[in-house]
A protein has these predicted regions:
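ATP-dependent carboxylate activation and anion-phosphoryl transfer catalytic cores
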Residues: 3-4, 8-183
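A short, hydrophobic C-terminal helix/tail in secreted or cell-surface proteins
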Residues: 188-190
Length: 190
C-alpha cells in the first residue's frame, strides 16, 4: 500500500508510480488496507491480488479488484524487499505441502528505500507515432529507479528509460484546468 499515481484519461500502465507514497494521508492508507482485506476475503483470494484505488475529494474509491498478479509485482517486491511471488506460492500450496500459512508472520514495516516505476515508451524508435496518451496502454515496458530520496529515485527511473532528455532549451507544459492540481512541479525559466 502506498504507491501514488496522478492520471486522468490514461491507462494506469502508462503512469509513473512512487513507493512509498509521499502524499497519501495515513487515514487513506488505513482505509485502503481495510478495503483490500474485506475485498480479498469476500472474493476468497488465495495468493496475489491487484487493487486499484483513487482518492478524490478526500474519499477513497475502489477502481478495480483483480484476483491475479500484475506486472508491477516484481517492482513492488524489489522496493519492499519482500518476495511476494514466493509468499503467494506458499499461500496457494500450503494445503498440498502441509506448511503453515506465512500470512500470520507478515508485519507492516518501513520500506528501506524509495522506488519509482516509470513506463517505457517506443516513441523514440517510432517518431511518426502520436505520443499523446489515452485510455489504451502505449508503454512497452517498465523500469525501476531505487534511491534514498524521491528526487534521486525519479532521476534513476527516467535515466533507465533511455529517453533522450534535452539539457537546455524551453519546455511547453500544457495542462487542462481540471488537471492542474495534479501538476507536482512548476517551471520557472531563469
Amino acid at each position: 500500500v502506498g504507491s501514488e499515481m496522478c492520471i486522468r484519461d490514461s491507462h494506469s500502465g502508462d503512469s509513473a508510480c512512487i513507493l512509498p507514497s509521499k502524499h497519501i494521508p495515513v487515514r487513506h492508507v488505513q482505509t485502503i488496507k481495510e478495503y483490500t482485506k474485506k475485498i480479498a476475503r469476500e472474493m476468497n483470494v488465495r495468493g496475489l491480488m491487484n487493487m486499484q484505488y483513487a482518492i478524490a475529494d478526500d474519499k477513497v474509491y475502489v477502481l478495480e479488484a483483480n484476483p491475479r498478479a500484475s506486472r508491477t509485482v516484481p517492482l513492488v517486491s524489489k522496493v519492499c524487499n519482500i518476495n511476494m511471488v514466493k509468499l503467494a506460492t506458499d499461500i496457494v500450496t500450503r494445503e498440498l505441502t502441509g506448511r503453515p500459512s506465512p500470512v500470520k508472520d507478515l508485519k507492516d514495516r518501513k520500506i528501506p528505500h524509495i522506488g519509482v516505476k516509470q513506463a517505457v515508451f517506443p516513441f523514440n524508435m517510432f517518431p511518426e507515432v502520436d505520443p499523446i496518451l489515452g485510455p489504451e496502454m502505449r508503454s512497452t515496458g517498465e523500469v525501476l529507479g531505487l534511491a534514498n530520496s524521491y528526487g534521486a529515485a525519479i532521476f534513476k527511473a527516467e535515466e533507465a528509460t533511455q529517453t533522450k532528455l534535452p539539457t537546455s532549451g524551453r519546455v511547453l507544459i500544457s495542462v487542462s484546468d481540471r488537471d492542474k492540481n495534479c501538476l507536482l512541479y512548476t517551471s520557472d525559466a531563469a
